[in-house]
Amino acid sequence: MGCIKSKRKDNLNDDGVDMKTQPVRNTDRTIYVRDPTSNKQQRPVPESQLLPGQRFQAKDPEEQGDIVVALYPYDGIHPDDLSFKKGEKMKVLEEHGEWWKAKSLSSKREGFIPSNYVAKVNTLETEEWFFKDITRKDAERQLLAPGNSAGAFLIRESETLKGSFSLSVRDYDPMHGDVIKHYKIRSLDNGGYYISPRITFPCISDMIKHYQKQSDGLCRRLEKACISPKPQKPWDKDAWEIPRESIKLVKKLGAGQFGEVWMGYYNNSTKVAVKTLKPGTMSAQAFLEEANLMKTLQHDKLVRLYAVVTKEEPIYIITEFMAKGSLLDFLKSDEGSKVLLPKLIDFSAQIAEGMAYIERKNYIHRDLRAANVLVSESLMCKIADFGLARVIEDNEYTAREGAKFPIKWTAPEAINFGCFTIKSDVWSFGILLYEIVTYGKIPYPGRTNADVMTALSQGYRMPRMENCPDELYDIMKMCWKESAEERPTFDYLQSVLDDFYTATEGQYQQQP
């Protein structure tokens, strides 16, 4: 296609720290230490050391692997749910996606349980410091989130070497502020573990207890486990087209050209966001066809579509609730206006990650902008409203020159010829970067839509903003290439933004 491409830099060097003297690459908030043994082939990890729970398929009643313990309490909502207390043990009878049928070992009652509220007994998943299925970058985001401080830590599975683990620790550096340091946990042939070869441990739990007593060569002593918010329970089994009366609208969060957004509750129990569409915005049939595609797109950086109400107007779209609202509103708020550039870059990287997933799925957003990105309590960004623009039937929108069409965010080929592709989304992402770095200002300030269309046809591009680094502006200009095929991929954009602050000069961390 002629697009700029780049492979993600997922190598062992970026994943951990060895306790020997070795060169370090500094970032603004993170320190990565090269692993001098990364070019050596590691011995296969024995099955007994694989991440517990990964092969949880067999349902032999005699197997200990069927026993799970509750990480959080759960009050059942439906008659066939099984309520339980934190610490209660249950035997899994059947797995049904995100809901499992189980039997309490204490009460002997049976029912359905949310699978993300439990963990297999005698595994790392029962430990509050173990974060399953988390990337290195998201581990850094979690540790830097409000509520954590220096000494906060977590254990995660290595992204690059299945069955291996890494320790991530929040530290404070006078020159760089809060930083995250990653330590690779190595395995012994006999099943033990170590970070420094000076001292080994029979299990990871013993290792954690040791480093909670003294730093012993780590950047600092381990203190509290990284805060882990209680997960939202999985959506109800087979609840897609739901009754309107099952939704209670509680608080109006905002209003747009095509409807309103509310905080509400489903069945008086699950907090959700509800988008109510103005009558005539789109046909129920066209929306349902698109929604059936949208609900298959599931990623940490995409807002989860739960259910719909389409039997009569207004159409309701039920999604996961994001506490901080839209990125646009957040950037304009008192809290958002105090966010520093490194976090703004991180917002951009998170959005690029979500769009890279959409890119891999051969899908198109069509309306990517700060108003359609939502922010969580822990400042995680998720992309919303992907695909909806395709089924809007409003004449002022479909005309493309109409007042409701987002001209300033749209690529020239999409404005002029209706040619929407993932590359037109890349153009929009460049405009979104402008919104982020200006804390929510409208692009092309002082220009009308007509002025913008004329200027773009003559090669005009927005100039660099005063507080925008040259390197970030270079990324914007790449997104605004006239030829769609010359624009970068979202995979490339994610890799560049993830490593935006990576220094090129190596430093050294001394062996303890």
UniProtKB/Swiss-Prot annotation:
Listed EC numbers: 2.7.10.2
Species for this entry: Rattus norvegicus
Region of interest: Disordered: 1-50
Domain Protein kinase: 247-501
Any one GO molecular function term: integrin binding
Subcellular localization, as worded in the UniProt entry: Cell membrane; Nucleus; Cytoplasm; Cytoplasm, Perinuclear region
Residue stretches making up the SH2 domain: 129-226
Gene: Lyn
Location of Phosphoserine modifications: 228
Major place of residence: membrane
Annotated tissue distribution: Detected in spleen (at protein level). Expressed predominantly in B-lymphoid and myeloid cells.
The keyword Nucleus appears for this protein: yes
Function: Non-receptor tyrosine-protein kinase that transmits signals from cell surface receptors and plays an important role in the regulation of innate and adaptive immune responses, hematopoiesis, responses to growth factors and cytokines, integrin signaling, but also responses to DNA damage and genotoxic agents. Functions primarily as negative regulator, but can also function as activator, depending on the context. Required for the initiation of the B-cell response, but also for its down-regulation and termination.
A Pfam short name: SH2
Binding locations of ATP: 253-261, 275
Claim: Glycosyltransferase is one of the keywords in the record: no
Protein name according to UniProt: Tyrosine-protein kinase Lyn
Modified residues (Phosphotyrosine): 193, 306, 316, 397, 460, 473, 508
Domain SH3: 63-123
UniProt domain comment: The protein kinase domain plays an important role in its localization in the cell membrane.
Membrane topology reported for the UniProt record: Lipid-anchor
